């Protein structure tokens, strides 16, 4: 087995029973691929597919003028280079975007020509605004902040059939309905009412009989009935009435008369029910007609108009009900044959026929007018307007788009469904197979008449009892709209606005000699894009607390947002877990609260297909043998197969073992024989999301707690020194690498140079492009603020001389340890009560944990100040501030900005700023004083940027931005100079490394080669030696050597050119950087200068901080106990954390207990390895012990491939504890945990005996730190990976004496942000009343709250030392009086 450079250092022992068939895919692929498809930058102009930007342009262009003589055509688009890179955009608060330019052609036709002739063509590039670019990690930088566009899970376009589940009508009758949902355009609904009449509505407007729509589509009554009904023909004669015998219609009917065969034998007696046997007898007897009673004709509907063949008189119209009068009329007129609609109560309802009777519209035009009146009430229906509206509703490509997905869904649901034999022979089968044959193939992205009729027919057939309704929560009916598609829709809507404006101007294009760029104003496009990225519900501020929260945010799918659901209307069904979520959407990870079930996370292996439906991978199974072939199946396809689970038992050849295998079929769990199985899951963790798959022993946790565990891992604050979890699941490395927090090598090579800011790698010759200088430089991110103010800091994980392969770890980031996700710390945990300090999930923690900075985290706050141009004059950033103490002034430089490295506390001035004050009338005394002392300071007021309350820290960076045309202060200039100096050094270092690398390659290439001549009189044909090269005055003289080998000479020339190019590039880059830094900054209107101060705040663990494990076991630190008081083990080691054992049973998250036991084994193994290393044992002994660890059970590791040095390095990395991986649903078994405990704590070891283990080695004797006595019972002790969450008490603690008051009520404001007071509510008042504390209550309700005069008086009394209270009238009482007066009731107050 090949281990990467980093994996060798710390191999994670996996308990997985099955080989990994499919690697975890790139976790951000959905976002990155979607946006790449939108931009199509890789494709040449003519190779671009009809997606993304290209599709948006194609859908709007060509734009034709109203008179038809001018049109604008789209040729292609290009994206320029962004002006600033990502860090610069973040610093300056601007959007990381590239300019979009479209090549547009204006074609003008000749008006005089008899046929369309092109008179003139004008073409040029038109600026279409800026398109935000995606960062390599799948986010966007909008106005300086990182944002994520969350994918949306919305209802797929197409046709859907459903019923109301009997909720509408009191009888519980099912009312069926259908809805045609386009991607863009009007919705068309069909619905049955309780009387079984069929109606339609457009865009949820007023309902109308469906026959109006059918008439509007061009059908008359007879044609409508012909489509939706089978016919019955009755033959009238003097002998009675006969009808054609259709065997299928007789079953279950009652014989109205005796049915006789030709000999007169009774086949079915009158009044008897006709059975299947009777039907066979009738068929065998060869009967073709049946006698019926004349009364049975009554109430039947005519299928067509009955016309007297002689006179041409219409005797009865289609759909007329047959009555006694009509029959008499037929008799008089000698009608011998009538055709009626075949209707029965069971499976051929009279719905359309009855609906037609309620519809009074006379024909096509009248029907269209009725629809017009419904859509545009109050507007006069002119013929042109009526036609235009009707055609635009469903048949115009401009206003209606079913989309590719919609068409596919529509066809599969209507035209391509499987019909039963009875349906094949009915009107429905004839309609689909004959009348509408081929309709599916010619269906475009607009509706056709056939589509509408087929939808109505399918709904009627449903009501007739044939077929199934759709499940709208099935993932085959919901699709994912990712970032590319969402942006395309916004771009298209912006272009549509442009189109309207352009059409107006196109008529003047020729006369005014306009060019395309004169016609197109790109403002609406950029406004639409800006609005979407800046304020759409799906454009969210990126959750950047730690790498996992970043990855999870980008993998989120939301059912909310424009075109989606709303929280209030979403019912239980939509939020619930559906069988089709399996392997596509995580059943565990979703928020608690109002969004539960509406916001989900993609499962680890899930991806979207071309149509936007989620699919998940399965291994193909053929004849009970599992193959290596992998197919991705969507929810619709999955329903057709029998699928085994990933943990099904296989033999060595991959055959399924056992008589029955647990499988899934159509969402149900079944037991199937191996030969029926068609697919098998690829991995046990396929069901869950990334966050849930990071929880070890997930299978032993209750789902509610697992949900909390998955959510709380995203809130873990990166610790100062990240520590890998001893018990993980094996997916930690994927998260760390894919989140781009840890840096991996782009190409293999040797590490040339390492410092805290940069890693330089000389690329291997075979990976470097020929003639190119192969050096990769990785600049690390240092102490950068994340969106949640946590610290992003990368640390090199390699040393000079290390040999790396592509994909090896180069640097660790926040919350990563050796390339693995490390959200918390491994803590020694004891489950026991301790003096009530772990009551209600409280956590008792050792002082040593805080002292060792195990949970210390650094938070970086950014504070801004702007100097504006005000009406009274410009604000000034200066050191000269009135009444500023010397201590504070000493921290500011001459420009008035705080020094880097200064330690600042609440209230300290960070940036001095003064604002001009309005001229006030001075008293004579003030005038005199001013005349004497020249006191001018009172003209300005101090508006400096001060450190906010409750915050203290160290200034780590200052940035100054100055508007173009305003002179920079010294500080701004020095920042620019130091930045340029650093950049120049960087470039010089790069050039030096490139040079060294190039000349090393040249030396290896030319030493030993023959030369035709060269510097220092090199003779022709002489061999080039190292000494000769060293003797040349400069290495650049090597290029003057003339080699005999022409290929080598060419390579030498290429390297020379490459170096020259690098030098020119470096100079060019320096000039660009200089220009960027020295040009003025783009600031908001009226802002002259802006200063940003970055402050690093160190937060130690303290009482009140929230902590949690990975199993939803959360709590608040109640006390930090001195280490000497903590419970300790027999060997004197104290535990780190004491948890309440009662927090486990009722919560049913037993995973934490198993984690603690396995963690305890990991720690014990680490201690044994540590002892062996201290005793300087031989590498062979270490190898033997590690073999027991890695190759006892579970997945086997190839330790023989490691050298002795690598074994020793591996062992030294395991000193603090072994690393275990217990994958979800395939984790360590109890026996394996026991095996590891026995390996860690062998019974023969005297040290182990001293600890006082129980038989299973899961509990030990602990001693009370205060008394030294042993606790009565043995205690479960072990190691758990414990996290500190982002709910820090430092950020919540707040106190106020006086502060701002509300304007109306004059009560103190609420909340820390407003520096508000504590709410003293109704229940608190009751408490004081209960105690009879009248005076306390009085001051609470008056002077401490809203008695304005009283609180001023109170202040005076305290200053004077008079401790008495003068309570007056609360202002809120005056508010109440005013409110009552506003109701027209006057209240007068009387004094007593």
From Swiss-Prot:
UniProt GO MF annotations: DNA binding; DNA-directed RNA polymerase activity; ribonucleoside binding
UniProt keyword annotations, A-Z: DNA-directed RNA polymerase, Nucleotidyltransferase, Transcription, Transferase
InterPro entries: DNA-dir_RNA_pol_bsu_ext_1_sf, DNA-dir_RNA_pol_bsu_external_1, DNA-dir_RNA_pol_su2, DNA-dir_RNAP_su2_dom, DNA-dir_RNAP_su2_hyb_sf, RNA_pol_bsu_bac, RNA_pol_bsu_CS, RNA_pol_bsu_protrusion
Enzyme Commission code: 2.7.7.6
Catalytic reaction(s) noted: RNA(n) + a ribonucleoside 5'-triphosphate = RNA(n+1) + diphosphate
GO BP: DNA-templated transcription
Subunit note: The RNAP catalytic core consists of 2 alpha, 1 beta, 1 beta' and 1 omega subunit. When a sigma factor is associated with the core the holoenzyme is formed, which can initiate transcription.
Reported function: DNA-dependent RNA polymerase catalyzes the transcription of DNA into RNA using the four ribonucleoside triphosphates as substrates.
Family: Belongs to the RNA polymerase beta chain family.
HAMAP family associated with the record: RNApol_bact_RpoB
Protein name: DNA-directed RNA polymerase subunit beta
Species this protein is from: Neisseria gonorrhoeae (strain NCCP11945)
Species classification: Bacteria, Pseudomonadati, Pseudomonadota, Betaproteobacteria, Neisseriales
């Amino acid at each position: 087995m090949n281990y990467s450079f980093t994996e060798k250092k710390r191999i994670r022992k996996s308990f997985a029973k099955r080989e990994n068939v499919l690697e975890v895919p790139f976790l951000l692929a959905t976002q990155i691929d979607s946006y790449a498809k939108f931009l199509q930058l890789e494709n040449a102009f003519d190779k671009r597919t009809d997606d993304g930007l290209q599709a948006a342009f194609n859908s709007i262009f060509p734009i034709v003028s109203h008179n038809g003589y001018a049109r604008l055509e789209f040729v292609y688009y290009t994206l320029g280079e962004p002006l600033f890179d990502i860090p610069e955009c973040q610093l300056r608060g601007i959007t990381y975007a590239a300019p979009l330019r479209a090549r547009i052609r204006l074609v003008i036709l000749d008006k005089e020509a008899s046929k369309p002739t092109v008179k003139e063509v004008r073409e040029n590039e038109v600026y279409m605004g800026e398109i935000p670019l995606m960062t390599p990690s799948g986010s966007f930088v909008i106005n300086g902040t990182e944002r994520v566009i969350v994918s949306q899970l919305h209802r797929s376009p197409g046709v859907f059939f459903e019923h109301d589940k009997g909720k509408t009508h009191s009888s519980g009758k099912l009312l069926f309905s259908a809805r045609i949902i386009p991607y863009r355009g009007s919705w068309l609904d069909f619905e049955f009412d309780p009387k079984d009449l069929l109606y339609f509505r457009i865009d949820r407007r007023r309902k109308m009989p469906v026959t109006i729509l059918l008439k509007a589509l061009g059908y008359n009554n007879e044609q409508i009935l012909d489509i939706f009904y089978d016919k019955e023909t009755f033959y009238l004669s003097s002998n009675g009435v006969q009808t054609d015998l259709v065997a299928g219609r007789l079953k279950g009917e009652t014989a109205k008369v005796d049915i006789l065969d030709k000999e007169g034998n009774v086949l079915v007696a009158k009044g008897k029910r006709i059975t299947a046997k009777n039907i066979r007898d009738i068929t065998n007897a060869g009967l073709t007609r049946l006698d019926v009673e004349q009364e049975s004709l009554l109430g039947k509907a005519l299928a067509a108009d009955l016309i007297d063949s002689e006179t041409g008189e219409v005797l009865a119209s289609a759909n007329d009900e047959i009555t006694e009068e009509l029959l008499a009329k037929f008799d008089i007129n000698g009608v011998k044959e009538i055709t009626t609609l075949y209707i029965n109560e069971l499976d051929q309802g009279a719905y359309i026929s009855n609906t037609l009777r309620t519809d009074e519209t006379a024909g096509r035009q009248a029907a269209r007018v009725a629809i017009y009146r419904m859509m545009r009430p109050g507007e006069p229906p002119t013929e042109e307007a009526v036609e235009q509206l009707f055609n635009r509703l469903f048949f115009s490509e401009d206003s209606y788009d079913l989309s590719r997905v919609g068409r596919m869904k529509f066809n599969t649901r209507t035209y391509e469904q499987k019909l039963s034999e009875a349906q094949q022979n009915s009107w429905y089968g004839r309609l689909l197979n004959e009348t509408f044959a081929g309709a599916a193939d010619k269906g475009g992205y607009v509706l056709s008449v056939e589509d509408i009729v087929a939808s109505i027919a399918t709904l009627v057939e449903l009501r007739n009892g044939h077929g199934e309704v759709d499940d709208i929560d099935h993932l085959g009916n919901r699709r994912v709209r990712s970032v590319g598609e969402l942006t395309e829709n916004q771009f298209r809507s912006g272009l549509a606005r442009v189109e309207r404006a352009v059409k107006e101007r196109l008529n003047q294009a020729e006369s005014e000699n306009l060019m395309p760029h004169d016609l197109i104003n790109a403002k609406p496009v950029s406004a639409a894009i800006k609005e979407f990225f800046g304020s759409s519900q799906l454009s969210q501020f990126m959750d950047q607390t730690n790498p996992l929260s970043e990855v999870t945010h980008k993998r989120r799918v939301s059912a909310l947002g424009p075109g989606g659901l709303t929280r209030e209307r979403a019912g239980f069904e939509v939020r619930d877990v559906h069988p089709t979520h399996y392997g596509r959407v995580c059943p565990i990870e979703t928020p608690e609260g109002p969004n539960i079930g509406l916001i989900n996370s993609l499962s680890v292996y899930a991806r979207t297909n071309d149509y936007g439906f989620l699919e998940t991978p399965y291994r193909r199974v053929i004849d009970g043998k599992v193959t290596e072939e992998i197919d991705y199946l969507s929810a619709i396809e999955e329903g057709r197969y029998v699928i085994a689970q990933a943990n099904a038992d296989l033999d060595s050849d991959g055959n399924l073992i056992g008589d029955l295998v647990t499988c899934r079929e159509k969402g149900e769990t079944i037991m199937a024989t191996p030969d029926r199985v068609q697919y098998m899951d690829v991995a046990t963790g396929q069901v869950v999301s990334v966050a849930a798959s990071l929880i070890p022993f997930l299978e032993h946790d209750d789902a509610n707690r697992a949900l909390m565990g998955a959510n709380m891992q995203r809130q873990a604050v990166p610790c100062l020194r990240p520590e890998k979890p001893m018990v993980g699941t094996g997916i930690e490395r994927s998260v760390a690498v894919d989140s781009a927090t840890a840096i991996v090598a782009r190409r293999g090579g040797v590490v040339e140079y390492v410092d805290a800011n940069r890693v330089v790698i000389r690329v291997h010759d075979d990976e470097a492009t020929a003639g190119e200088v192969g050096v990769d430089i990785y600049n690390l991110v240092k102490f950068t603020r994340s969106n949640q103010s946590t610290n992003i800091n990368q640390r090199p994980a390699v040393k000079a001389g290390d040999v790396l392969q592509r994909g090896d770890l180069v640097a660790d980031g926040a919350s990563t340890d050796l390339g693995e996700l490390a959200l918390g710390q491994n803590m020694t945990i004891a489950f026991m009560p301790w003096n009530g300090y772990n009551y209600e999930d409280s956590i008792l923690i050792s002082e040593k944990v805080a002292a060792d900075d195990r949970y210390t985290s650094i938070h970086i706050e950014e504070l801004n100040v702007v100097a504006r141009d005000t009406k009274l004059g410009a604000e000034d950033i200066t050191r000269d501030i009135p009444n500023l103490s010397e201590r504070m002034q000493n921290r500011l430089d001459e420009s008035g900005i705080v020094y880097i490295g200064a330690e600042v506390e609440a209230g300290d001035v960070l940036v001095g700023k003064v604002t001009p004050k309005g001229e006030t009338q001075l008293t004579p005394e003030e005038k005199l004083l001013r005349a004497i002392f020249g006191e001018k300071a009172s003209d300005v007021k101090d508006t400096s940027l001060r450190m906010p309350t409750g915050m203290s820290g160290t200034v780590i960076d200052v940035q100054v931005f100055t508007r173009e045309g305003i002179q920079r202060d010294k500080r701004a200039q020095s920042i620019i100079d130091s930045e340029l100096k650093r950049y120049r050094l960087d470039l010089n270092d790069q050039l030096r490394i490139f040079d060294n690398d190039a000349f090393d390659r040249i030396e290896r290439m030319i030493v030993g080669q023959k030369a035709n001549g060269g510097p220092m009189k090199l003779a022709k044909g002489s061999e080039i030696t190292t000494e000769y090269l060293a003797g040349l005055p400069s290495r650049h003289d090597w290029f003057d050597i003339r080699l005999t080998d022409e290929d080598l000479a060419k390579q030498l020339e290429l390297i020379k050119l490459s170096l020259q190019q690098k030098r020119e590039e470096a100079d060019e880059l320096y000039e660009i950087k200089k220009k960027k830094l020295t040009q003025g900054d783009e600031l908001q209107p009226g802002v002259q200068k802006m200063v940003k101060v970055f402050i690093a705040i160190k937060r130690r663990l303290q009482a009140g901080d929230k902590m949690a494990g990975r199993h939803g076991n959360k709590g608040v630190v109640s006390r930090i106990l001195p280490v000497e008081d903590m419970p300790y083990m027999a060997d004197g080691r104290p535990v780190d954390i004491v948890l309440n054992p009662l927090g486990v049973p009722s919560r049913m998250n037993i995973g934490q207990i198993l984690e603690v036991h396995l963690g305890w084994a990991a720690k014990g193994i680490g201690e044994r390895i540590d002892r062996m290393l201290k005793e300087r044992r031989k590498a062979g002994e270490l190898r033997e012990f590690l073999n027991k660890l890695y190759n006892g059970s579970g997945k086997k590791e190839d330790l023989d491939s490691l050298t002795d040095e690598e074994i020793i390095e591996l062992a030294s990395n395991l000193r603090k504890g072994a690393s275990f991986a217990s994958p979800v649903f395939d984790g360590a078994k109890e026996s394996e945990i026991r095996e590891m405990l026995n390996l860690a704590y062998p019974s023969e070891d005297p040290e182990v005996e001293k600890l006082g283990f129980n038989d299973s080695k899961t509990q030990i004797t602990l001693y009370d730190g205060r008394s030294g006595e042993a606790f009565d019972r043995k205690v479960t002790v072990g190691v758990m990976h414990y996290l500190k969450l982002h709910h820090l008490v430092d950020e919540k603690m707040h106190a106020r004496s006086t502060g701002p008051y509300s304007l109306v009520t004059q009560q103190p404001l609420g909340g820390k942000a407003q520096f508000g007071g504590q709410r003293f509510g109704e229940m608190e008042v009751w408490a004081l009343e209960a105690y009879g504390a009248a005076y306390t209550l009085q001051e609470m309700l008056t002077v401490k709250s809203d008695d304005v005069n009283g609180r001023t008086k109170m202040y005076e009394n305290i200053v004077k030392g008079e401790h008495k209270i003068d309570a007056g009238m609360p202002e809120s009482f005056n508010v109440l009086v005013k409110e009552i007066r506003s109701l027209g009731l006057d209240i007068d107050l009387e004094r007593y």
